[in-house]
Amino acid sequence: MIATEEQARAFVAERCDAAGMERIEALVAALRSENERQNLVSKGSLGEVWQRHIADSAQLLDHVSRETGLWLDLGSGAGFPGLVVAAMQPEKPVLLVESRRKRVEWLTDMVKALKLENCDVAGMRLELLEAREAGVISARAFAPLEKLLRLSARFSTDTTTWVLPKGRSAAQELQGVSRKWQKLFHVEQSVTSEEAAILVGRGRAKT
């Protein structure tokens, strides 16, 4: 379990090259600055930004093959996990979906500042996004699980990997969705908090 900011930084550094780490450092610096103007993340979490946001995002890569096609990040907000993934793995195509104007502006500015040619921002509600096949679907605090699965199912294929960070109620949330979805997922312990977990899934529910 990651217990300190130093451990969190080391965890991230082990999963990307030096250039990737420079991009993440730049992201953290920009986040600290911008958070004084808009509440991208809670002020209390900035003291543990590497644990709470960066490593928490980076750990999802451990559950995903590098050859997965498009990474679709729903409700990207401040950029977690999608922007972190794009910065750490610039060869991986990433699409950040976010409807809130100020968040869209922040994400667009960071994609440009970090020179992430692999990353695009869709500034719209997910319901309006044109259907496309996603190799990975991620979502952090986007919507209740049942709604999330219902809205995003049209982007999934038989080989799609789902990585959905959740809190202590992850297993309970999974029990609350239909059986056709339950059988695709299992619960993984988060490495950043004993009270957090990740719902990891594979494939698409059969209708």
Swiss-Prot record:
EC number(s) stated in the UniProt entry for this protein: 2.1.1.170
Chain positions recorded as S-adenosyl-L-methionine binding sites: 75, 80, 126-127, 140
GO cellular-component term (any): cytosol
Keywords: Cytoplasm, Methyltransferase, rRNA processing, S-adenosyl-L-methionine, Transferase
Keyword hit for Lyase: no
KW Transmembrane helix (keyword) present: no
GO MF term list: rRNA (guanine-N7-)-methyltransferase activity
Xref: Gene3D superfamilies: Vaccinia Virus protein VP39
Localization in the cell: Cytoplasm
Primary enzyme class: transferase
Reactions the enzyme catalyzes: guanosine(527) in 16S rRNA + S-adenosyl-L-methionine = N(7)-methylguanosine(527) in 16S rRNA + S-adenosyl-L-homocysteine
InterPro entries: rRNA_ssu_MeTfrase_G, SAM-dependent_MTases_sf
Function: Specifically methylates the N7 position of guanine in position 527 of 16S rRNA.
Protein family per UniProt: Belongs to the methyltransferase superfamily. RNA methyltransferase RsmG family.
NCBIfam families linked to this entry: rsmG_gidB
Protein known as: Ribosomal RNA small subunit methyltransferase G
